[in-house]
Amino acid sequence: MPALKDTAFFKELTKRKSDNATIYAGKLLEISDDVGSFLEYTKTTFPDYPDHGIQHSCRILNYVARVIGTQICSLSDTEIFCFVLAALFHDTGMSLVGFAAKNTMRSKHPVNAAVAIDEYFNKALFTLKNKERIKTIVTYICKAHGLDLDAMYKDPEFYVVDTINGDNVRNSILSVF
């Protein structure tokens, strides 16, 4: 059973000796436990749907790491943090009990994930430096999960580049994973 600490993204982050990497790695372990519990509700809402718990997020991270190979080293600490957060949160829109009709929840879950992300950031990550900017990026990456390439290329958010905690963060790179 894959665990966050066993993913290439988490290992890459923990290899780095920067303050950002240390802070982000610690936060990710806490967040993965919280999100893992929340994602269990997907099984209740969609009992016939394949498992989309925390292991699914870890499988995605491992798959993307295999695809990008050594290019993982060119990602900034903050890019890794944002991408891992998006992998953890991308299916939370399917766990929002009473949020939407079941038949539309699945198709809209990439956008609906913003509700879970917003609530989690406000309640559990209120001390995170540059919280709002990181939340915006994670929300966009999750939204991009439901877009085709043409729609992404037409979206101005796709082209956003930010510098957060001294790190470049490129939506275009993170959203196409």
Where are these regions (language model features)?
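An active-site-proximal "capping" alpha-helix that borders the catalytic cofactor pocket
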Residues: 60-67, 106-123
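Histidine/acidic-rich helix-loop-helix segments that form or flank divalent-metal centers
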Residues: 122-177
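A generic secondary-structure signal for well-formed alpha-helical elements
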Residues: 91, 96, 117-124, 146
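Amphipathic alpha-helix face/heptad-repeat signature
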Residues: 53-56, 109, 138, 173
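Acidic/His-rich, divalent-metal-binding segments that scaffold phosphate/diphosphate chemistry
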Residues: 1-99, 105
